[in-house]
């Protein structure tokens, strides 16, 4: 995955760095003890399913453009997934971060629409609720055993599409961070002791 602040890749579900078997074959070993937010283990079947649903032309996924170099994905065993590429691709490991691994057993049970309304992942925060055009709420997932566990119990993302509203929320300390700082507001925020990075 990519670290949200530094944008540097790190091992999220992988237990070790990707292993290059030959020019067009890579293997990924899953991290021991990784679970989804419903407590079920993350399996190689989930990884294969997650990639195949994006690569399936019938699904018309926009994410396919980021992994169009992948020919096929298969489970070697219960811990190792093998990727066959159409051609050698130096950014293979970085592009894997574009695909989020989802629990096949949940989507099979409830369907894609219900899953989209209440997604289940495997990261340090689990989905709690969402209010359209308002906010998304997450809470720490205690069993998470990855590199970056949650540092707070709860996190709310305010969905502020208006740039002026985002800046006002940041200035008033209603928010602790914001994205897409308008260029014209950078100096004003810095003058109010706000840290601005690009």
Segments predicted by a language model, with ranges:
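Gly/Pro-rich hinge or "lid" segments in bacterial periplasmic/extracellular proteins
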Residues: 4-5, 96-150, 154, 162-164, ...
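Short, well-ordered beta-strand elements
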Residues: 25-28, 47-50, 81-83, 123-126, ...
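Residue-level recognition of beta-strand termini and adjacent short loop/turns
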Residues: 22, 75-77, 132
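N-terminal lobe/hinge region of extracytoplasmic solute-binding protein
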Residues: 1-22, 26, 52, 120
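Surface-exposed binding/hinge segments that line
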Residues: 29, 35, 63-106
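Sec-exported extracytoplasmic/periplasmic mature domains
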Residues: 32-35, 52-59, 88, 97, ...
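Extracellular/periplasmic solute-recognition and catalytic clefts
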Residues: 54, 72, 128-137, 156-198
